[in-house]
């Protein structure tokens, strides 16, 4: 999944930062700021629309608070190593899309399948 994010950063069809790629998708203004018409745009709060973003773990509506600190620390270490050292880069052969094996998204047949890792299938543009 991290390799897909990094592949998208390098693809001009997507934002050119990791956070930009992860947060890509429609947003809506929070009720906390929407009620104030005179509030400047820079102070408004926007949230991803649930289940409408590119990466479901960003907009699933669940708390982002880590409850398993050991797993969270390991995930951070892997992400840092991946970004800094390039370890595992290319493992998805340039994939810009993926999905779990238990779903069948309508976009899947329009892309080239490049592989499977665990319970995820990876694709790239033709």
Spans of model-derived segments:
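Bacterial extracytoplasmic/cell-wall-associated proteins, especially those involved in peptidoglycan
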Residues: 1-126
């Amino acid at each position: 999944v991290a390799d897909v994010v990094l592949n998208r950063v390098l693809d001009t069809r997507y934002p050119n930062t990791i956070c930009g790629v992860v947060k890509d998708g429609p947003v809506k203004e929070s009720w906390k700021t929407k009620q104030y018409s005179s509030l400047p745009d820079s102070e408004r709060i926007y949230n991803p629309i649930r289940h409408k973003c590119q990466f479901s773990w960003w907009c699933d509506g669940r708390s982002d608070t880590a409850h398993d600190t050991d797993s969270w620390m390991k995930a951070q270490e892997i992400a840092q190593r991946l970004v800094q050292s390039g370890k595992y880069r290319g493992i998805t052969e340039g994939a810009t899309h993926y999905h779990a094996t238990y779903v069948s998204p309508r976009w899947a047949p329009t892309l080239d399948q490049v592989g499977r890792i665990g319970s995820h299938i990876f694709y790239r543009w033709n």
